[in-house]
Amino acid sequence: MAKKIIGMFLGFVLVTVLGVGAYAYTIYQQSTQTLAKTYKQIGEETKVIEATEPLTILLMGVDTGNVERTDPWAGNSDSMILVTVNPKTKKVVMMSLERDILTQIQQPDGSVREAKLNAAYADGGAELAISTIQKMMNIHIDRYVMVNMHGLQRMVDAVGGITVNNTLGFPISIQDQEPFNTISIGVGEQTLNGDEALVYSRMRYQDPEGDYGRQKRQR
């Protein structure tokens, strides 16, 4: 599922770039018409700069933004996926981080406490979550993308839904934890809207693999 979300995110970036690009092109045309009278164009060779080093992006899903969670609490990063893009091998590798891993979290005041990995975001936002993961795994994270539950719903709806394959053999729902939520995802290939995609990515208690199964659905 994260692959679809990455695609959505890149799509939003592309739309923004195209909009800015169209405006910039208009200004460029006006400028070149004026400058053409004052200088002579010289030959230039266009060079394409290609990335050579891997790029690591942290995707974080934060458990805020739901209709039942409107308090000012920052939330936990209950979903964390490392995405590494390697231009040399031309491969993209995705790895989920277990949210319940016990680790050392250095607090903003300099003290250190042992807590679950997902609590780092609640303690100090994206900056502390990133630094905690970097220290724990001895890696460097270049960029991050953070989305809450409402953000996920809006992204999915904005692209007209996403198609998933429910291979669990039974409908997916979270009504046992949230009785008001009556959404159920049928077995097999399904096209989901934002509300349904949120349920699909959150359910874990009914999954035989628990949180590991949920991580697979998120990826």
What positions do the PLM features span?
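Non-catalytic, solvent-exposed segments at the cell envelope interface
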Residues: 2-12, 16-219
